[in-house]
Design a protein with these regions (language model features):
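One-carbon transfer enzymes
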Residues: 1-237, 242-249, 253-272
């Protein structure tokens, strides 16, 4: 593993991806003069990432205010690599214009497809044949920067939001390991993103069909909708809804059943909204 040319490396992220990258870079920085720091935006103070940083004596800061995080990044004055790993903070123009600051970002789609948030949800709902991950440089356009490396995942009817997310995070770390040496030297082969009419910017509030199952869809589309919002026991997305006889219900669970006219058996709950 090559030593880093950077004075500092800041990992800004959440969850297992940020944690695994931090563990790897702790080894890299131990053999160099590079300072490793970690931070999170809107992360639980009791997360595995924050807990590991504290027990490993890696400087860690948790932010819940955009201005405070911007001030923190602005305090860096020497060559710095910022790794945005499963991070929801959008970097403002003054930060992007700093010549000594290099920023890369993990995104959970094959850019330029599905820019923005919950890309895995949209990839499943739109019945893409493949999904994947992209490591890219950060530019002024959201998820529009030059591509460092992409890895694909072939999709089939078994993929749910949760399953795809888990595979993407592991693939994202594997891809990071591939580029780590080049990244430490900032010696990357970059590819400009192709312009695509299919490139849509998804926002956090956006849900397929506003989160309501359309009973007129065919079985495959219904399945894609349900799987795209299936987060298991987590609460990463709101539960999908269904309208039966003019009344809206929350879909708590679903099971394929070809004997049911709807194609599925549902466990339903009262819907308050």
């Amino acid at each position: 593993m090559r030593k880093s040319i950077f004075e500092s490396i800041l990992i800004l992220g959440t969850g297992t991806l940020a944690l695994n990258i931090a563990k790897k870079l702790k080894e890299v920085c131990a053999d160099s003069c590079t300072k490793l720091l970690c931070a999170s935006y809107l992360e639980s103070p009791f997360s595995f990432f924050s807990t590991w940083c504290k027990t490993s004596k890696i400087p860690y800061t948790s932010f819940h205010d955009k201005t405070a995080l911007e001030d923190y990044i602005n305090n860096f004055k020497d060559s710095t690599l910022l790794i945005s790993a499963h991070n929801y903070y959008l970097f403002p123009a003054p930060i992007l214009q700093k010549p000594f600051l290099k920023i890369i970002n993990y995104h959970n789609s094959l850019l330029p497809l599905h820019r923005g948030l919950n890309a895995q949800m949209w990839s499943i709902f739109e019945q893409d044949s493949a999904s994947g991950i992209t490591w890219h440089c950060v530019s002024s356009g959201i998820d529009c920067g030059e591509i460092i490396l992409q890895k694909s995942i072939s999709l089939d009817s078994t993929y749910t939001y949760l399953k795809l997310t888990q595979e993407q995070l592991q693939l994202g770390f594997n891809a990071f390991m591939e580029i780590c040496d080049s990244l430490m030297q900032w010696n990357l082969s970059l590819k400009t993103q192709e312009k695509s009419s299919d490139s849509v910017l998804h926002k956090a509030r956006d849900l397929p069909n506003n989160g309501i199952l359309d009973l007129h869809w065919n079985f495959e589309k219904k399945s894609a909708f349900l799987r795209s919002m299936d987060c298991g026991k987590s609460h990463l997305l709101p539960k999908p809804k269904i309208i039966l006889k003019g009344k809206k219900y929350t879909i708590l669970n679903y099971t394929e059943n070809p004997k049911n006219a709807l194609g599925f058996d549902f466990t339903l709950g009262e819907c308050n909204g």
